[in-house]
């Protein structure tokens, strides 16, 4: 695998394209799921392939190069549920703690902060344990996929409630044609971008 990195200077985004294989080559697309008109990119089919190890390693290297070598990153936050896989791998490789942001109603003890956001097909609420992050922390938010950016931006607001600073986002796949203007302005490292 050879990584070609194209850095968009103004937005701070980094798109990595795999010269031989793209993550979507290993991802099943399910049409009209979870509701009609929505296409679901099933990253579980990528996780089940040896190619996932290479994708995770390359994403980790780019994140580490961009953030952690300068000491600009103290934690990785993963968004439930597939963001747990991506985020935990990034945190482990980089050598920083991993924090989970969960969906409201999940088993998460203690006092919680919450943030509600709109989905393409409804709304949802995310929670984080109060006191798990603080003012000195600098956080990267990780998920499998960014579409509108609703859950990513809600997680950003949630992390900011703790007093921590969000330095950027990382994902395996970015559906750029669905990104809101707010999401387009955020620093993002992604393995593959779909423009449509």
Regions picked out by a protein language model, each given a short descriptive name:
Residues 1-196:
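PRPP-associated nucleotide enzymes
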């Amino acid at each position: 695998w050879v990584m070609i990195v194209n850095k968009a200077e103004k937005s701070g985004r980094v798109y990595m394209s795999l010269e031989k294989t793209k993550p979507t080559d290993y991802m099943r697309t399910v049409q009209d799921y979870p509701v009609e008109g929505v296409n679901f990119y099933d990253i579980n089919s990528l996780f089940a392939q040896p190619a996932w190890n290479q994708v995770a390693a390359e994403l980790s290297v780019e994140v580490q190069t961009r953030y952690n070598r300068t000491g600009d990153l103290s934690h990785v936050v993963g968004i439930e549920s597939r963001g747990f896989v991506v985020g935990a791998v990034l945190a482990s490789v980089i050598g920083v703690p991993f924090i989970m942001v969960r969906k409201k109603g999940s088993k998460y003890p203690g006092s919680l902060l919450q943030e509600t956001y709109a989905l393409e097909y409804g709304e949802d609420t995310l929670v984080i344990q109060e006191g798990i992050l603080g003012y000195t922390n600098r956080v990267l938010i990780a998920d499998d996929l960014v579409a509108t950016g609703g859950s990513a931006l809600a997680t950003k607001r949630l992390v900011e409630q703790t007093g921590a600073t969000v330095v950027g986002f990382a994902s395996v796949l970015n559906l750029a044609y669905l990104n809101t203007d707010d999401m387009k302005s955020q620093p993002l490292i992604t393995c593959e971008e779909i423009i449509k």
